[in-house]
């Protein structure tokens, strides 16, 4: 698949285009230009690395939405074995914006749940652009209760602009479905490991993100509203999205410093979309470590620590100024 470059990656895109032309020339010529191609490839990697080392929050938001980033089903294929997808909420329908099922993680049975976006137009519509309806959250809830029944750890992968705001979703109880998930996940008696792999959009993300260990990929985002939405409210213009992203603190590094997540998982040079397999292997090691930290806790200890974690959000200390 040909790499899609973002606007700020144009210098890299130009260099890659030049490399592609040289490859074409080499295929049709007796002249050996492999050294020149290798030199330009090294230059491209260095340029990309330097570019990504100083991304702004708004640029990170764009990377988190990159159409070629690995999605939940990609990680299910690369990290887990024997994945069997389960469908439906047993109440209304099967929401394709959330996928989930049984799998094995290093030989251990587990449950995998996550948002799923589409690659092409047809799949994007099928997946509703990764925006779940109530039946999607109720499907996730059904799988979490199944995990609790059989004592299986739960791995959740978050990547959504937010819960679907359509009238049909509201009629079927969107807010109740999200609230119910938060309530049940807070007291689920099995380990929950959550990873924000792309966009973490508001309650639509949080509904499968109440975990014992919460991680974020390096160029993922997590926020109560999109930068464009925030800018439209505060400045009456989505053109202020860059300023909003800076103000909101949506990046993994910022959220780690605030204690809202436990770990930042580094991405390959140029982002996770550049190398799905490398990203999956890095994430697998992080998941192993996260599960190891909670695997030996009793159900009561899991719930106690999870509730303590939730209640710690927003705490602050007052200091008197002399």
From Swiss-Prot:
Cysteine disulfide partners in this protein: none
Stored InterPro entries: Acetyl_CoA_COase_a_su, ClpP/crotonase-like_dom_sf, COA_CT_C
Keyword set, alphabetical order: ATP-binding, Cytoplasm, Fatty acid biosynthesis, Fatty acid metabolism, Lipid biosynthesis, Lipid metabolism, Nucleotide-binding, Transferase
The protein's name in its UniProt record: Acetyl-coenzyme A carboxylase carboxyl transferase subunit alpha
Keyword Lipid metabolism: yes
Gene3D superfamilies found in the cross-reference section: 2-enoyl-CoA Hydratase, Chain A, domain 1
GO BP of this protein: fatty acid biosynthetic process; malonyl-CoA biosynthetic process
Range of residues in the leader sequence: none
Gene that specifies this protein: accA
Pathway annotation from the record: Lipid metabolism; malonyl-CoA biosynthesis; malonyl-CoA from acetyl-CoA: step 1/1
Biological role stated in the UniProt entry: Component of the acetyl coenzyme A carboxylase (ACC) complex. First, biotin carboxylase catalyzes the carboxylation of biotin on its carrier protein (BCCP) and then the CO(2) group is transferred by the carboxyltransferase to acetyl-CoA to form malonyl-CoA.
Subunit and interaction comment: Acetyl-CoA carboxylase is a heterohexamer composed of biotin carboxyl carrier protein (AccB), biotin carboxylase (AccC) and two subunits each of ACCase subunit alpha (AccA) and ACCase subunit beta (AccD).
PANTHER family registered for this protein in UniProt: ACETYL-COENZYME A CARBOXYLASE CARBOXYL TRANSFERASE SUBUNIT ALPHA, ACETYL-COENZYME A CARBOXYLASE CARBOXYL TRANSFERASE SUBUNIT ALPHA, CHLOROPLASTIC
GO molecular function, a single term: ATP binding
Record's keyword annotation contains Cytoplasm: yes
Family: Belongs to the AccA family.
Enzyme nomenclature, EC number: 2.1.3.15
Reaction catalysed by this enzyme: N(6)-carboxybiotinyl-L-lysyl-[protein] + acetyl-CoA = N(6)-biotinyl-L-lysyl-[protein] + malonyl-CoA
GO cellular component: acetyl-CoA carboxylase complex
Start and end residues of each CoA carboxyltransferase C-terminal domain: 32-293
Subcellular location: Cytoplasm
